[in-house]
Amino acid sequence: MKYEPVKIERKWQRYWETKKFYHTHPSRKASEGKAKGNYMLLTEFPYTSGNLHMGHWYAFALPDILARYLKMNGHNVMYPIGFDAFGLPAENAAIQRNISPNDWTEDNIKQMTKQLKSIGTAFDWSRVVKTNDPQYYKWTQWMFLKMYEKGLAYR
């Protein structure tokens, strides 16, 4: 019998995905006795400037372990992943490659998603946040305007 990690990992990753094991289940309420408690874990969003590296996993490992531990102990855990997709470095990299900044960003998000899924992270992939999504940044703009109106944002 030969150990084939890629084959075995893919098998279990497909199983977890079909069972929606890492999805958040908002209907599981602690008050109904279906979950021991609700938790939300959030890691910093990787900047979409290229491939992930070991430093990214270093930042994700402890929250990933905690998400798994809480889930295995009956807690409802929301553990989304996001991508920090705005900034001059990404725009400049896209211009240097003669492609649109949006295409550059989306390609990097796809690559990072593939990398993160391949190592079996416990993220809830049904709750991906992308800061370049208008449905996301319209709210950050709204919050900034409210802070500005109240004198909390100034030059």
Describe every region a protein language model picked out:
Residues 1-29, 33-155:
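N-terminal, positively charged nucleic-acid-binding surface of large information/translation enzymes
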